[in-house]
Amino acid sequence: MIVKFSNKLFEYYFQELAKKIDWFPSIYSIGIINLFEQRAIDNNKVFENCSFIFLHDEKPIACFIGVKVGQKGKMNIRAYELPSIILIDEMNFSKNQSKLFILEIEKYINDIAGIFYYRDTMLDGSLSILSKHLLSKGATAIPKFSIFIDLLESEKKLKSNIRKSYKSLINWGEKELKPSIYDASNITWELINDFRLLHIKESGTETMSELSWKKRLDTVKRGEAFLIVGH
């Protein structure tokens, strides 16, 4: 069974699948995807969300996050501003199910005249089933390296990994600024809106719509992000 992004149950199954993944890229959370969607609307982009979740025995075992986006006549597939991604519960994913999963993704790839952008995290050094399939069809791979900071580490360990040129800035900030941390428990629209108005005043222009700012607020309320303000 396939559950598409437009289905009200998509978010529930998505969260259930994310719990099973050893490392879930938070940049692909529902709140962030909703924010990127709003930015696409603000920029008058043409798009169609193709994301879906693959179920087996009413349980989510795989997910594709991808969106047809671009201009009429030439649509690419990506996750709005990010490459597309797949999430798989490897423990419960059979070879036959993987074939059906790839076939479903291929339907969307074959329906566009543009490029299919896809990101494989390769956490264990292995390519995903989709990467192997795409490479066998002549896809081009471009390796990129990312560094992720584990904020659950102690403050001492986090500071030990900071380059010297940044340490002086942090030391200055600790002396001169009074940081306030906002999360789902204390964030408000009034705070975000004050920051939005300050941003407009200082930049001299409105770079994001009010709805985009509200989507940012939603990511904090969902527990997917937090805000640090220094004054």
Identify what each model region corresponds to.
Residues 2-57, 61-73, 121-231:
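A conserved beta-strand-loop-helix scaffold within acyl/acetyltransferase catalytic domains
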Residues 71-139:
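Acyl-donor binding region in acyl/amide transferases
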